[in-house]
Amino acid sequence: IKLSKKSKIFIYGTGVLKSWNINIVGNKDEVEDNFRQDSNLLTGCVTFFGIEIYDIEISSINNMCEDAINLLNVKGFIRDINIINSHFDGLDIDFSNLEIQNINIENSGNDCLDISSSILEIDTFYSNNCVDKSLSIGEKSTVKITTFESLQSNIAVAVKDSSNVTISNKLGIENDMLSLIHI
């Protein structure tokens, strides 16, 4: 799916979204100052809302919204998420309960992964060149990550608001400032 200026995708409904491969391509030259949220207060170039998903793959390249991908009140299993060149946050997960096999995020203008009020199990998380945080966890979230790698970000992991994170294997944590902060 090719997104043009001011276009967004909103995926919602009953039932299960199963075995889909979703590829979103934006235009990094079409940044608009007031595009951080739309008239429905949606912040994602692609927003999944209130659905169950199983065995899907999502990729996003050159998307300029507040969140390249936003998972809001979603449950299920995601095989792969790949995000390259997001103007602000790469992936925003709110109020969700998910198992994710692989997350790869590169070149985010803010946080690579922002998690709020969610329960997540992530097998492999890799990020490179996140301007702010590689991984931000807040609002009573519980996150388990088997393998974590963060390169060239300001902060590798920030945990706040009574949230918990467990990281089993830490590989290649090379960032500008802090490796782990807890607020």
Predicted regions located by residue number:
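Extracellular beta-rich repeat passengers
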Residues: 1-182
